[in-house]
Amino acid sequence: MAVVTASSAGPSYAPEDPTLPKPWKGLVDGTTGFIYFWNPETNDTQYERPVPSSHAVSAPAHKSSVFVSSSVEKPSQGQRYDADGGHNRGSNNKIARSSSDRFHDGTSVHEGYGSLGVGSDISQESYCRRNEISVTGGDVPAPLTSFEATGFPSEIVREMHQAGFSAPTPIQAQSWPIALQGRDIVAIAKTGSGKTLGYLMPAFIHLQQRRKNPQLGPTILVLSPTRELATQIQAEAVKFGKSSRISCTCLYGGAPKGPQLRELSRGVDIVVATPGRLNDILEMRRVSLGQVSYLVLDEADRMLDMGFEPQIRKIVKEVPVQRQTLMYTATWPKGVRKIAADLLVNSVQVNIGNVDELVANKSITQHIEVVLPMEKQRRVEQILRSKEPGSKIIIFCSTKKMCDQLSRNLTRNFGAAAIHGDKSQGERDYVLSQFRAGRSPVLVATDVAARGLDIKDIRVVINYDFPTGIEDYVHRIGRTGRAGASGLAYTFFSDQDSKHALDLVKVLEGANQCVPTELRDMASRGGGMGRARNHWGSGPGGRGGRGGPYNSSYVGRNGGHGYDRGSRDSDRYGHGTYNADAPRKRSRSRSPNIGSGWSGKKSRFTD
């Protein structure tokens, strides 16, 4: 459990917090683990965080773009949540809007973790402005800019420092106090922003307060689009949940169900799962979600892009309507907005950066090289030789065949290894472990690894082939420049990619990057097709109605968008036709132009 260990039920001192006004001190209730505050001169105690009277600021009760708040607000006795701890929802998990509070006793179980202000050396407005934080919602707590200010148990704070983190990232700083109040959240932030710990840390505290019998099912459920991201989330949960003594299992396709079912039968607090595999196990009646009170949708935009919406909605129907729901996404298209409106109640939206346009990480230096296809091999070798030996580098290819071919050519001199959908789970795990350890410092991958792959110290990303859409480009290069580090991205761009030229120019300009003259010329000649549509392909399209054959989203057979409702595997595509772990035959509708993708009636997912 995520508790503060103490020899008795008496209070103990909280970690030193230099932002507290003197002479106030933080104390931890030895029974509940709540943080409260004590003035040794007056012997007053209170849950509200004390603020200097000279610059106390009241929290606005209206929606705000940059939020300012300064103290814990105890819920009034008139505010009550449902008896089982959640907002009122309809029978189909459709929102039944209610002003009721979340806990039946009239107080929040997270009072001690409420709106803890930022340090006196920087105003909350300045912090939000500097980190491009905007918040929509009423009575939103101020960001927590230090681990000590969070009120997390000292063991968790110690683990964060031991992992090399000096302070919360912006998404953590703003989302933690909201989540700790038990509220629903939509958090929109770029990849590499620290979102995983943004929801895991409050999950540990949630477990401390509301842990159920793990033999009867999990308390925490995290849904993830890919097995790679799911296993990484599990690793983070185990790493930072040691002091909380949590049990966590991971459910994903492409691996035998037996070991996963055995772990479930032993009882777990947290389940991290891909939607397809979890649906399989639900249909087998081998897991119950009836105790889940904390639900996370990680990379929600990617899950919808991959067509998981039917599976997600089916899963959510198995989860109690009285729950806390957190949705994390890198982008904010219409589909994500719709499912957020359906599944979340009175949510607070936290934005890091501009969510209305696709923005690349500005800490990544992007080099676009307009080259002929036959020049790519020579150029990639030049780039690899120019880097420090042992530097971790990811090279993205558009097809499995090219991925294998390129890795074979680079293995001898550069220690390259390949990962794609035809690799077994064991092969993938081995290649990733070798890459993480630096024994195979060059990873050649298809887009199966483009989202959710969280490996530290990736110095360079090379786009050997340009992806099928500008969104995937941004997510690919986002493998480097993570957690505040700088990164390099090289992209080979050919005439066959000219339809993406205008969109690429916009991304480069938005990140203050140099735009090559040749690329700008391509865009001026009409490349990109971006003027007739937005980034989400909402313009007129073919049978799928999703923006025509150049839309970067995935389109199933007969215009269907995504995976089959009856899919049996987390990686099966369309009407049960796509399986990332089995060899696939090429469709006869494949265009002879390699760069043109699939026709409008077929899936354009090439991995």
From Swiss-Prot:
Q: Which reaction is catalysed here?
A: ATP + H2O = ADP + phosphate + H(+)
UniProt region (Disordered), positions on chain? 1-25, 66-108, 519-607
Which stretches make up the Helicase C-terminal domain?
Answer: 379-523
Q: Where is this motif: DEAD box?
A: 298-301
Q: Compositional bias (Polar residues) at which positions?
A: 1-10, 89-98
Stored CDD domains: SF2_C_DEAD, WW
A GO MF label:
ATP hydrolysis activity
Q: Which residues form the Helicase ATP-binding domain?
A: 176-350
Which keywords does this Swiss-Prot/TrEMBL entry list? ATP-binding, Helicase, Hydrolase, Nucleotide-binding, RNA-binding
Q: Which InterPro entries match?
A: DEAD/DEAH_box_helicase_dom, Helicase_ATP-bd, Helicase_C-like, P-loop_NTPase, RNA-helicase_DEAD-box_CS, RNA_helicase_DEAD_Q_motif, WW_dom, WW_dom_sf
In which residues is ATP bound?
A: A189, K190, T191, G192, S193, G194, K195, T196
Q: Which residue stretches does the UniProt record annotate as biased composition, category Gly residues?
A: 538-548
Motif Q motif at which residues? 145-173
UniProt cross-references to SMART domains, sorted A to Z: DEXDc (SM00487), HELICc (SM00490), WW (SM00456)
The first-level EC class reads: hydrolase
* EC number in record: 3.6.4.13
Positions with biased composition (Basic and acidic residues)? 99-108, 562-574
Span of domain WW: 18-52
Question: Would you identify the family this protein belongs to, as annotated?
Answer: Belongs to the DEAD box helicase family.
Q: What is this protein called?
A: ATP-dependent RNA helicase-like protein DB10
What organism does the UniProt record list as the source? Nicotiana sylvestris
